[in-house]
Amino acid sequence: MMKGVRFHGRGGEGVVIAAELLAAAAFKEGKGVQSFPFFGGERRGAPVTAFVRVSDRPIRLHGPLYSPNYVVVLSPFLARVDVTEGLKKTGLLLVNGQGRRKRTEYEGCRVVKVDATKIAVKLGLVVAGFAVVNTIMLGALARATKTVTIESIQAAIMERWPDRTGEKNAEAAMLGFLLLRGIDKAG
């Protein structure tokens, strides 16, 4: 069965790399994958979106991902972006956040949270003043959806950065996996 994942964040948070790492992890598990970003000529801090398709079979569909199964929001500061647009009714929204949002804000979808910013700051994953939360969110996604294993996420991270950077990001992914907070049915 094919699953679609849409990532939302701001330039500099690692949205595109998150999509690439998820695709690499799924590929390591023998799954069919597609990964593609969507952004304009914006700079660091501007909204960025990336998409991933994961399937047990080769993917022959080539086009935009309008109805994802899962949406991952890396930035808690995307006020002007409707992150739930097109999210399937049985979909899951993974949010980088600490407090409870108003129940009507994400009406009708399952919501899972992890305070990825706090974890990133604690681990020193900060670049130019931005907490880089992508690998933390991937760990949480692995636990929430079981689309890929945490081990595959960590292997993809270490393949991309085979040094201390990889070790720190693999640790970050595990913390995202372990510190994921419960699923709520909003609305």
Model regions and ranges:
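Active-site cofactor/cluster-binding pocket
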Residues: 1-187
